[in-house]
Amino acid sequence: MVDSQYYLPNDIGVSALECGEAFRLLSPQEKMYAHYLSRAAWYGGLAVLLQTSPESVDIFVLLQKIFRRQAPAELEKVATAAGLSSEDYQAFLVYAAGLYANMGNYKSFGDTKFIPNLPKFKALVWASQAFQEQSTEMEALWNSCSCLLYSLEDRQKQLGLGDKGITTYFSGNCCLEDAEVAQKFLDSKKLSAYNTRLFKKDNGGKVCYEVRLASAVQKDCAVEGECESCCGNYSFEDKEFIVRRGDYAPLMEKVCSYLQQAEVYAANENQKKMIEEYRRSFTLGSIEAHKEGSRYWIKDKGPIVESYIGFIESYRDPFGSRGEFEGFVAVVNKAMSERFAKLVSSAEVLLPELPWPREFEKDKFLKPDFTSLDVLTFAGSGIPAGINIPNYDDIRQSEGFKNVSLGNVLAVAYSTKKEKLTFLEEADKDLFLKWKSPSFEVQVGLHELLGHGSGKLFVEDDKGKFNFDQSKVINPETGELVSSWYRGSETWDSKFSTIASSYEECRAECVGLYLCLNKQVLSIFGHEGQDAMDVVYVNWLSMVRAGLLGLEFYTPESKSWRQAHMQARFVILRVLLEAGEGLVGLEEVTGQDGKPDARITVDRSKIPTVGKDAINSFLRKLQVYKATADVEGGRALYDKYSTVSDSGAHNFLRLRETVLLRKEARKMFVQANTRVNGDNVELVEYEGNAAGLIRSFTERFQDDADQLEADLLQLNRRDAPCWLFELGSLLPPPGY
């Protein structure tokens, strides 16, 4: 019997992202700008299919062909005639919606595979109009993905590197050691891994690695500017490396084409130069060009239409260095943005409150934009609640960054309507319902601005110049002079690799917990007196509960975490439990249904004392290890609290089973499309259900659907042999 965690439930929450009012307030020029940026984002987002699993592209194309010819309502009649029950057909729609929402058949939040919860998938494919019209092509598509569609062999249950899971950031014969030597090579050439994939081959008995850059240009000829000398053959540590361009080339061409059209409607020179550099980046595979575009983006203060695009977050690279493509376009929510602007203005007063010496903070706080946005488009594998970007350490440290809170995402994702309030005491539930969303708004603001936006990295550049006084700065954890730092081209991601993402999320979450105790912060968000105290309590209670819920994202077989944020929250739960003195309670109980359950409690009177002291000490350690590039110390600390075992005061392995028993599926979002009609841009909205989500995707790519699908399949076929190592007999041979 298949574990239910690998199915998406038929009653999964699906909600439309409301952006109609914000869009209608835009000028005609702003609407055109938003439209073409959205098109660029959506086409680039298709690269995520190729970054997720070997079968994702084939499943996507199969579904597109079916739904382009028959909308969900029409296809339902065919399904009934083919012998599917209404529950079976709903399961089919939910699976298809899940594939679109996650841009692949692995959950974007948790990296677990999901499979169709119906046995008659093939019967429906064969009965579809698409099959009647193109039976040979549809049968070939089905044969190429049908085994992997349902397969739950141990390695295929989750994303991972080597024997820990599936990844298409690396060829199937790569392991952690290959990722490490490739990172050393990239560092030696001052190349970023963000827009690369790694393919390991045998060249006459000698190991050869291909580093492939995402670019529209496929030839490795010399071109003007950065990257002209990076492509070619190299020898490094007795291994061969080939750096070449052309990954996702047809998709990058579309991205560049739409960006060029968006540039015509840019509001200012910063936006124009930003887009020019993005185009250069996606044309040549140049991260340096993307960094330059990001600099112009930072300078573009307070735009009405905000956007960002590229290979951004490294959560899903098992090694933690390669970025998943994402692009968003959003409209500023002025009322909410005023609160965040006040928080930015208070940042220089709040930063000294953080528990590390002044030398461990940036020399100067570069006040960023911090806006609340209503999302029009968010292309990629999932939609976050807030963002702090760019992720380039050198820019963040000395030039600045931007923060955004995605208001319409928060309104839907963190709504308490229909939520199962698991693991809470009855006495806490009403308070939790009332303050969950407001408290999370405070946490997101602090997490993004003063979490990700705080803290210095100690660096020695290529010329031997230090950004700190190594003869005076004392490590507060040892009482001795700082003895380690980042050298040359080393970055936070390249040094801390596999734990970097989760560790940094944990640091930012701790900053949020710590500073939400500040009355000035609470006042900025409109909370005073008892209301402010309730917001603090629910914020801490939410974090503790999230730490328990995080166990869903731990895989005992490989002893690995599949989601950076949830690992971070579990770590914080462990820290607060360790603090003792009755601050946090966690006990296993029997539920009213007779099944295992659990209850968490937080003593609100001890949050400002025991709780604050515990976070103070832990947060200081996190920052010190990060600032000093102390990988050994940081990893030992983080691994200690990340451990999930059945020993000690709490049996977390058994609690994990309870969490899985009572888990609730993550919501999916339906996003609108934009369409040019003469001189106007129309917003096309869809119903908030699985059918609406499906329609949004089929209509999104209908203009050049046949060519696009052919391009995707060709890209996937080219690399099919590279996945044979990890998929074994399940993957048909090349040429299928």
Language model features by range: what are they?
Residues 27, 268, 440-463, 480, ...:
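Active-site recognition of the HExxH zinc-binding catalytic motif
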Residues 595-724:
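Extended, compositionally biased alpha-helical segments that mediate assembly or anchoring
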Residues 19, 48, 492-495, 499-506, ...:
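Long, well-structured alpha-helical subdomains associated
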Residues 93-96, 100-440:
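Contiguous, non-catalytic segments that form substrate-binding/exosite surfaces or channel walls
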Residues 76-79, 269-276, 461-467, 521-541, ...:
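Short, glycine/acidic-rich hinge or "gate" loops at secondary-structure transitions
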Residues 724-736:
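Glycine-aromatic micro-motifs
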Residues 455-504:
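Post-HEXXH active-site segment of zinc metalloproteases
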Residues 2-74:
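N-terminal-proximal low-complexity accessory segments that begin disordered
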